[in-house]
């Protein structure tokens, strides 16, 4: 496969953009390759600068549940552009999308629009702190909630130990307010609560961990978090930036029947444009400025083009049978890849929830970050490069989720499974 123009672009980009990319994982560094530069996309297919076509299972890291360039999304945004691209003022479109989100997501009674998932999570945490009057938060190892300082923190040694920065530039004094528990382990949460009684403002969790591969919650885990938070007066935040409108129309909280106090959203609600949102109980959300004292603002929050794309996307997701069809496509792909690995004699551990799935390069069960980190990342990197040569575009990391869209055809899925079998055989 010729990728000479992508190589030229990457060399040029590295001279003017740090690392040559505007988000680190795009550099393909962890898979020992150089990125292909994408120039256009349609349906399930993306096309690079050298005119190579790939079946895409990244989907812009989750937003493209309808596939690329859905004609109704394109048409609606084109019409909206004719009325102006940004006003910095309230619009009726904001109300329309907010009403749709409130109707869809069980925990959300009021919602505030922002421009990214990181904005959503950092604002939700600030609001939880303001509402409770407490400073500390609990997050989980392996869960990613954006690049805000309080969230770039890893666990210290022992339950009572404060978190330590996971990136240069995060002050140690700031990181001490973030406590880290083990995903799918209620006992680790209870130990932190016991050590920091009445200090914890919120617990933030991906209800389905999607940033260490795809790791579903074990039975009772989310229920246990709900009970702990209720008993301790702690705000439970579900980070559904990835799972919202993805694993069900009402997100993971609808799928599992567990209602948090607050929810963060992003990706799908923007229809491919930059949108985030956070919402929850009315009594909490009313503490936001200008109705309350907790400050949050944004120049492009509620951008009319993004609101338009979001509204049209949610309308399409409401069509009869949408999630049933998506579930079948996803099941066929995930089971097909797992079967291809078995036939090739290569061991993997496969997980899937709805249209999110992951093939972990390990023999053992993956249920938290420690078990995910046991994967053979070198073999995954080889597999990734081989699949790319076969025209299959996967996330360039063992610890990312693959996404299926409604645009993926049975032919796409069959081709992907056949390519996977061939690539597993080479390992």
Curated annotation (Swiss-Prot):
One of the protein's GO biological processes: protoporphyrinogen IX biosynthetic process
Domain of life: Bacteria
Keyword Isomerase listed: yes
N6-(pyridoxal phosphate)lysine carried by residues: 267
Pathway participation: Porphyrin-containing compound metabolism; protoporphyrin-IX biosynthesis; 5-aminolevulinate from L-glutamyl-tRNA(Glu): step 2/2
Coiled coil listed as a keyword: no
Gene3D superfamilies (UniProt xref): Aspartate Aminotransferase, domain 1, Type I PLP-dependent aspartate aminotransferase-like (Major domain)
Protein's name according to its UniProt entry: Glutamate-1-semialdehyde 2,1-aminomutase
